[in-house]
C-alpha cells in the first residue's frame, strides 16, 4: 500500500509509542547518516533549522530534507567546506489500522474492532523551537547554507525558520 499523506501524521495527541521490546515488527530507521560533510572543520557560522510548532516529522521526510540539503551543499560549497547534522531521531513508531476500500469490504474487515494498528513507519516528535537540522559553514558560504536549509524546510511538514549564529 502507498504511504498516507504527511498531514495524517503531523499532529500527535497520544503518548509516544517507542518501546521496541513490545513491538513485533520494528520498522527500520530510514536515515543512514545523521552527520555529513566535514565534522572536524573549523567553521565560524552555524545555521539552524528550527520548527515553529510542535508536531511529528516522519523519517522519510527527514531523509528527503537531508538528501536535498546535502546535495545542494556538496554541489555549491564542496564536501570539505560544510558540516550538516540531522539533530532529531525518529523514535516514535507510527501505526495504521489498514482499511479496505472496495465493494464488499464490510464483510471482510472488522471496522474499529481491534483497531490498534500495525507499525508502518517512524517519526520524530519535535517541540516548538526545537532544532531539526544544523549546518556549520564559513561566513562566505552563508547564502548557500541558507538556500540549502530553505530547500530542506520545504520537505518538512511543519512551519520552520532559519537562525544564523556565530560559532563559539
Swiss-Prot record:
HAMAP family: Ribosomal_uL16_arch (MF_00448). The keyword Hydrolase does not apply. Keywords: Ribonucleoprotein, Ribosomal protein. GO terms for biological process: translation. One of its GO terms (cellular component) is ribosome. CDD domains: Ribosomal_L16_L10e (cd01433). This is Large ribosomal subunit protein uL16. PROSITE patterns: RIBOSOMAL_L10E. Belongs to the universal ribosomal protein uL16 family. The keyword Protein transport does not apply. One of its GO terms (molecular function) is structural constituent of ribosome. The lineage of its organism: Archaea, Thermoproteota, Thermoprotei, Thermofilales, Thermofilaceae. It comes from the Archaea. It comes from Thermofilum pendens (strain DSM 2475 / Hrk 5).
Amino acid at each position: 500500500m502507498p504511504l498516507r499523506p504527511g498531514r495524517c501524521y503531523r499532529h500527535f495527541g497520544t503518548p509516544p509509542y517507542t518501546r521496541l521490546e513490545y513491538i513485533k515488527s520494528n520498522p527500520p530507521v530510514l536515515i543512514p547518516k545523521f552527520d555529513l560533510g566535514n565534522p572536524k572543520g573549523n567553521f565560524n557560522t552555524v545555521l539552524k533549522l528550527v520548527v515553529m510548532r510542535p508536531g511529528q516529522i516522519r523519517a522519510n521526510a527527514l531523509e528527503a530534507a537531508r538528501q536535498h540539503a546535502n546535495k545542494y551543499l556538496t554541489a555549491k560549497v564542496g564536501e570539505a567546506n560544510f558540516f550538516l547534522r540531522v539533530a532529531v531521531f525518529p523514535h516514535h513508531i507510527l501505526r495504521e489500522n489498514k482499511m479496505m476500500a472496495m465493494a464488499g469490504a464490510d464483510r471482510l474487515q472488522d471496522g474499529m474492532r481491534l483497531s490498534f494498528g500495525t507499525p508502518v513507519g517512524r517519526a520524530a516528535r519535535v517541540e516548538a523551537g526545537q532544532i531539526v537540522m544544523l549546518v556549520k559553514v564559513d561566513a562566505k558560504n552563508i547564502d548557500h547554507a541558507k538556500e540549502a536549509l530553505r530547500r530542506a524546510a520545504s520537505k518538512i511538514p511543519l512551519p520552520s525558520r532559519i537562525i544564523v549564529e556565530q560559532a563559539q
